[in-house]
Structure formats: C-alpha cells, structure tokens
Amino acid sequence: LAVRHGDGNMSTQMEVVSVSTDKENQATLTTVRLKDKVYPFYIDVRYKAYEDVDMIETWTEISHTEKKPVYLTQFASAYLPIRRGNVWLSHLSGSWANEGQLTQEPLQPGMTIIKNKDGARNSHTSHAEVMFSLDGAPQENKGRVIGAALCYSGNYKLRIDTDDSDYHQFYAGINEENSSYTLPKGTVFQTPAVALTYSNEGLSGASRNFHKWGRTYKLAHGNTVRDILLNSWEGVYFDINQKGMDQMMGDIASMGGELFVMDDGWFGDKYPRKNDSSSLGDWVVDKNKLPEGIEGLIRDAKKHGIKFGIWIEPEMANTTSELYEKHPEWILKAPQRDPVLGRGGTQVVLDLANPEVQDFVFKVVDDLMTNYPEIAYIKWDANMAIMNHGSNYLPADKQSHMYIEFHKGFEKICQRIRAKYPDLTIQACASGGGRANYGILPYFDEFWVSDNTDALQRVYMQWGTSYFFPAIAMASHISAAPNHQTFRTIPLKYRIDVAMSGRLGMEIQPKNMTDEEKDLCRKAIADYKKIRPVVQLGDIYRLISPYDRLGVASLMYTSPEKDKAVFYWWKTEHFVNQHLPRVTMAGLNPDKKYRITELNRIDNQPLAFEGKVYSGAYLMANGLEIPYNHIVDYHKQNDYSSRVLYLEEVK
C-alpha cells in the first residue's frame, strides 16, 4: 500500500483496532480493521474462509474521512510471506493462439514480476494465478503447494520479492501503472480478491481445490454439465447464410450434438458484416444473409431437435459503423490524438466507464433475449486491447481511473445480464483465451481456451490451463485437417481424443467430412455423453506432462466416489523404436476393481487389456502397457497415437 494524504504526507502507520467474525453462507468472514495512528484513514482486511472447499479469499477495503481526497498509488489485494528454501514457481504465459504455456522455475534472490497491461483482457500473455511448490522441483501428485489466484479481469501485477535468506514476499493486486486513484472522503475502494489454497498432494491437489471452488462458487452453472456444440466460425467464417446454417444444424444434430452456435458475420444494416473491418456496434440482422432472420434459425434448430446460440462482441465498435457515426464520443480515445485502431484497421473499444455505454452494451443482450427468448447460448468476444488511454466520460483529473472504471463498468453490465437472464449460457471468448480469469467467470459458464484449435498444441495449452481452471470451463473443439492455424494435418482420432478432455465441441464444416469421419464423431459424442459427468465434474490427476518432453502426455479424471475414471494418453513426438514411459494412474480407490474400455477405438483389434478388470492398487502401482502406435491398415498409418480409456467399478 502507498498513499498520499490530503496534506501531502506520503507515509502510513497502521495499527489494528478491531477483529470481527461473521458467517456468510458456507464461509466464515473475518475482518481485521486497521487505522492510521494519526489520520482518519482505514483499511479493512477481509478473509473469507470456505467451509466446504480448501480456499481462503482475501481483499482490502480502503476508506477515510480526511478533509481532502487521498491519493492511492499502490493498492495490493494481498500479501503472503513464505519462509522456505528451494521454492519453485509455476505460472502461465503465452500469446494469441499460444495461451496457457506452463513455466516452472526456482525462486532466486531478486524480484519476479508477472503483470498485464492489455486493459480489456488479461490472460493471453500471462495469467493472474500462480503455484508455489515448497519442497523443491514441482511434482504433480505429491509435495506441499500453495496456490494463488487474483480474481480480476483487468490489469494486474503479481510480485515476488526473494532475499538471500530464503524469504519470499508475495504481493498480488491491480496493476497500479497508469492507474493511481483519487479516493474522496467517505467512499470505499475495494480491491479484487486473491484466492489462496494449500495442498500436500502436489500441483494436481492444488488444481483440484481450485476446480471444486471454481465450479461451486466462481463459475456460472458450475455444477451443470455443458452441451456438446458446433460453432460455425472455422466452418464458414463470415459466409453466414440461412441455408448454410440449417445444413450445419442438421449435421451436428445427426452426430448427436445438442447446440449450434452462429458465429461472426450475421449483422449490419448500412454496413453489412462481410469481414472484420466494419459493423461492430450495429447489432441488427443482415436480411440479405438471413432473410428469415434469427427467428428462422431458431425454427430450424427446433426442427433438428437442438438449441441455438449466437456470437456478439458488444464492448467493441468499428469506425465503419452506424454506432460510431452516431456516438464517436463513446470510444476510448486520448484527447487531441487520433485513435489507434485494432482488428480490421477500424476496431475501437467502447468506454465502459460511461453509464450510457453500459446501458447500450446491456441492451445488446437484452434486445436479443427479449426478441428471441429461445436463444440458449451467447458467445461473447473481445478482440482488442485498450490501445487508447483516454475516456471522454471521466473528468481530466480522473483519467488515471480509466482502467479500473472500465472493469467496474464491465462487471456492472455482467451483473445486470445475470440478474435478468440467470439461465443463459455465456462463453467468455477474447481473441481466444484472453479472459480466463476468476474475476469474470462468475458471470460466464466457460471460456474459449484459444483461437488455435490444433490438437497437438492444445495438449500443451489445455495442460497449463488445467492448473487453475476445471474442464467444464475449457471449451475444446474438434476442428478440420489441415488445421486452420498451424496447417498441420492431424488424424481425426487424435483431434477427438484431445477435445474430449475438456468441454467437447466441434469447429468444422461437417459437409466436408466423409461418412466415416462423421460416424467416428457420432460414436465419440455418444461416448462423451457417458463420461461427461466424470470429465466436467470430476477430480483431475495429471500424470505425465508434455512439458517434460518425454514423448507422451497423460492425465485422468475420477468421479468423486471413485467408481468411474477417464484416462487420456497422447503421444507428442514420434521416432522409430521410441521408448515411452509407462504411465501409472492416480486418484483411484486401491481396494476397488475397475473394468477397462477403450473409447474411440480405430484399431483392427482390441487392446490387450480391453474388458479386463484390475484393482485400483495395481493400476496406480503398475499402470497399463499402452501401445505406441495404432494397429490399422498400412494406408491409414501415421505418426500420431492417442488413447482414451474408461474405467468403471466392478462390484
């Protein structure tokens, strides 16, 4: 904390004046009230300890009754000292189409800073979540681990100060750069919460704590399994039309899918949305593309027995749009400067600090749901960072509030939407995984892990993302080959096996698939419906990391009762006479017996252990001998191999 009091004094001397405890649903809320020794300046440090999950949230509330405003220049949410040698840090980094990359490193004397300055999204390049392994190099299923997650969707800063006596001081909160805040008398500045957990069962144990807490408290409908969907984007891109959407709906319905989502390209009147250079802000149906309108699409979805969803990007506009022509003052822009433009050379970000803009963004959703109440799903995108530091709404002396007020406005919009449409499913897409954070997930059901749907790269991205977020929140889609981002040709079996480890969906034009491919997807979707509760609501155990470069990656989910499990195995490299490690399982009941069934089998003959029964103790001590290659006809052989095994208790 750093402040400047109204008289210019830049010091604080806080002392505890009271400690109180209250019950709050399934949690105990402890408040430590601090007061400056001289000034009427107060800090309430809050600790919310959950009774049914191993998680504590902590945040601060800053207030004062000084005669003049107080100037806040640093305002961390939490401070955690760790007095321990040989501590390792696990954290995520990356970029667009390469999100969730895992980095693990020992903490050395000095300062480690993980921060974000995007403004609108905050999890492309780094994440506001970390894990500390207290017993040396990180291990997945043993060892003591502290996990921390800042529950915020805006600019953040995590800082770890390490001295030469093995003392680590961890700070987490809003990134104060360009965000100093003037606090008037009698108002309260509340920092976002930091969630803290502890596990003596390794990194996977800390992940299980985050997942259970997330599903129960920090994710919309977190304990309700998700629909299997087809999204139109990689199938047709902007080429939206009534007949094409009907065809895609019919195809996904025939494969057992439950939901169709029409992506970008459906809107615009004066400026029809033909590409990414126009129309954002003009949320009216393009009647040339969709002469029967959205009501016609919903009618087609009903005909095929599936639900209907739609894509929007309501926080954004294009300079080529009717909205911008009418309200140029609604965009974020520095005074006396031309705006820096984003995607398509025309994209700009709306000023969510402005209540009128908040009303407009809410109305985008409200109008859709009022006019078409049978819309079941909204894909909410955000394809631009805040590149223009300036708000026409905020006064000149409050411009440093812009980033903070933007996210306050965003949360207000989300709260209004959830209050009126509590049952609506909403995905947080932000140029892929830009909004994977626990600040906004209470208002969203899931997030799009990445715009990169390449199955091999998704193994790495989804592995890292699983450190903090449950499978039910991770949208994972089967896409085309060659892949549209990497141009890599990956067999359908492998693509399915990767997608089935998250919230399964499809991102493909089904009419370009062969009957054999559709049949494999049809069987996979049927099998996924059987294992869906285990994957989406179960406990994760990561077994072999792709980042260890052992040629294979493996993880599994177990049901809470440990009567069912799903085991995943993906080969990540291919060499002749390759040695791959034998994978031992985890999370099973050693005293129970499990029958093994392979899902998505393409081999000409069953695996040696197909249908056989093994004890949990055996599987966790010895594992199974997984063949390195598929036994298929010569012309179908390739360098990819993957397995999904379903384990079910035999009583």
Language-model features: where?
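Catalytic cores of secreted or luminal carbohydrate-active enzymes
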Residues: 493-544
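Short Pro-Gly-centered flexible turn/kink motifs
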Residues: 181-200, 640-648
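C-terminal beta-sandwich/jelly-roll accessory domains of carbohydrate-active enzymes
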Residues: 573-651
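Aromatic-lined carbohydrate-binding/catalytic grooves of carbohydrate-active enzymes
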Residues: 221-363, 372, 376-377
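Carbohydrate-binding surface patches
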Residues: 130-132, 140, 546-590
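Conserved, mostly hydrophobic/aromatic
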Residues: 60, 186, 301, 361, ...
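Polysaccharide-binding surfaces and accessory modules of carbohydrate-active proteins
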Residues: 1-161, 177, 593-609
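Active-site neighborhood of glycoside hydrolase catalytic domains
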Residues: 291-293, 325-327, 331-493, 503, ...
